[in-house]
Amino acid sequence: MLRRSLLPIAICAAVAGAGVASAQTGESLSSSWAQVNICNASQLGARAQLAGDGSSSQMSVRFTLQWLSPSGWVPVTGAATSPWQSAGSAEYTWGQAGWTYNLTLPPGHAYQLRAVAELSWSGENARTATHTTGTCTAGG
């Protein structure tokens, strides 16, 4: 009975060890993404995940809130771009950070909104990437 219950634990430990080894060789174990996690008439929240690569690089992200105007996607007026947010060290498999915008929308009007996330890894493996969230409709 004891032997049967230890087998799944041994398999899990072997898989976990393989994941750590891959992260240390610089292979990305998870993907980077950005998404809207709050969408209503008074707030839009955006969140991003940055994939770690096992290095000592620092990961950070900033967001720019956009609305769909008649001429295409443009930044909202006011403070459209957030400050840089720390997502932690790339030593780990992934890091996340987010930003919440407070909205003031005219009553009776609905707007299509999205956020553009600028992802940054600094240090020995410096690089950047851009991800765009899905859209949401706020107001109405």
Labelled PLM ranges:
Residues 2-8, 12, 19-140:
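Low-complexity, Ser/Thr/Pro-rich intrinsically disordered linker/stalk segments at domain junctions
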